[in-house]
Amino acid sequence: MNLRLKRARELAGYAVQLTKDEGLPTMLKRGAGFVKRRCFGKKARYLPAKKVLEAQRAEMAGKTAADCGLPTISVLTPLYNTPEKYLREFLDSFVNQTAPNGQLCLADASDAQHGDVQRIVEEYQAKNQRIVYKKIENKGIAANTNAAAQLAAGEYLALADHDDILAPHAMYTMGKAVLQLRQRGEPDGFLYSDEALFSKSIRRPIAAHFKPDYAPDYLLCCNYICHLAVFKKALWDAVGGERPECDGSQDHDLFLRLLERTGGAAHVPQVLYYWRVHAGSTSGGTEAKPYVAAAAKKALADHLARTGRTGTVEDGLFPSTYRVKWDIVGDPKVSILIPNKDHIDDLEKCLHSLWAKTSWDNFEVIVIENNSTDPETFAYYQKAQQCYDGLRVVTYPKKGFNFSGINNFGRKYATGDYLLLLNNDVEVRNADWLTELLRQCAHPGGAAICGAELFYPDETLQHAGVITGLGGYAGHSHKYKKAGGSGYMFRAATVQDLSAVTGACLLVKTSVWDEMGGLDEAFAVAFNDVDFCLRVREAGYRIVWTPYAQLTHYESKSRGGDEKDPVKARRFASEQQRLYDVHGKANILDDPYYNPNLTRDREDFSESDDLRSLKEGRVSVRWR
């Protein structure tokens, strides 16, 4: 009864925090989903079907690590006073793997009062020669992990905590993923999977962490990779293993150093690791282990120093998150392009906020007049150009509305190092908004494009990046979420690598704009920003979004969609088809910075109703 009461209190605390972060509707929706899964849903929803696991075991029957055809993966696990229940569950999860290509390397630093740890391990060793063990002096988590690595015989290493659980198909799936990469001639130095949180049983998981493909800017904000990471032992040896001075964030530090050498990673969208939530675990938050933040900031600062980039590492918006305030190189000029047709009240609000609130002063504004009919509009233009130093109004010569054509025309008058596409119904919220956009681009190795955090007037999110494939074409990350929330895996509160951002506020290097030939004028109204971003990414550039540049977008939530007007509906369908034709429908529906196990029907990062790929144990991997 006490355990049930404790669990109820934990859930109540989670519900209160979720309500504070994301609002009552989100909490109720998630709560309903939890009750549905708990009471009516299938158990073990992230595990492959029983027949799939049986087929894997049949494939590997009678084989050893030497002849199973899969690379050997040595799992490094430091032990320290591990409770018997947790230890046995962890050891069972290794012993019951569907493939024999794993080796378990245990370095035991338990004190004299916990001799049962050694006894239990020796009991398992007697039945399984793939478990190796060494009693060591306790020198901290990093040094103890390094001691475990000295026992490793595998081509690959993986890290696992002593109180967690490996999914039964973890070694099989990672081994097969390596073979897939090799068959395609792609790098195979670093792989990572999705994971889930659990408390009592992995058959009743709390939630999953469905991760994006390799996202280097996101990784600088939090260790989203976490478990299960698998990497070549040769790389581990090259970087010298884990660093004791980063104890608490030793894995984050290790991943940064490994990825400096690989230049990328492969993501396997299968839940291969179960992270136990209990008092004192890092899965319960850094409040349980406050030294984690200091170690993480050191790891990040050292990473910047090694890679020759300069900036200041600070705490992020939430515990376990961080931010790099990149040093801006030089004094880049920004040309702000604002298309406008009448609506001078909106335009004046926008312009006033630019000059009244923007701390970055090296900018010019080019208003692109597009077929206005109200005489007051033209009178306002004259007044505004006298009032705002650096404002110029130019007239688009063609009839009709073509967002791409209008901005391409405005580019001809721009003199900045960067272009900023900005809607006329946007208002600045924080003084450093333009500085923060530039921070992400105007430094060595910076992104080519950066998008901003846009809010509706009612303080809900309008834009935290674009996810392609939502609704069949594209949608906005965390749309309608309450302002100030962390979002899914902190993705509404940390710098994000993305496939696209909205053209309502989009900063791009002028040189990249010119290289791409600007916006494609075949996309007159819809998807011009998405198409442009995809072309930029396909050319090898990065696109990011920052929560530190905030503006209000007065676009109406209730504005009718194009499908309500037959002419607009046909135009929308045509532009959607062109998006498919240019970039491939399969690519549009498979955003690498999303996850195939998340829904395509909503913009809230909720789980897909169809987790077929998990139930089938489908082995897919993508290097990025």
What kind of feature is each model-predicted range?
Residues I136-A152, Y396-A414:
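Glycine-rich, basic loop-to-helix element that forms the pyrophosphate-binding segment
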Residues N2, K6, E10-C68, K289-D331, ...:
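C-terminal, non-catalytic tails of nucleotide-sugar-dependent glycosyltransferases
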Residues P269-T286, G316-Y322, F455, E521, ...:
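Active-site donor/metal-binding and catalytic loop motifs
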Residues H169-P205, V426-Y473:
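Conserved donor NDP-sugar-binding/catalytic core segment of glycosyltransferases
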Residues L235, E245-V271, L300, W433-L437, ...:
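A short, conserved alpha-helix in the catalytic core of glycosyltransferases
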Residues K36-A288, D302:
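Nucleotide-sugar donor-binding/catalytic module of glycosyltransferases
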Residues G154-I165, G416-R429:
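Short beta-strand-to-loop acidic/aromatic patch adjacent to the donor-nucleotide binding site
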Residues D92-N101, H352-N362:
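Short, acidic, metal-binding catalytic loop of nucleotide-sugar glycosyltransferases
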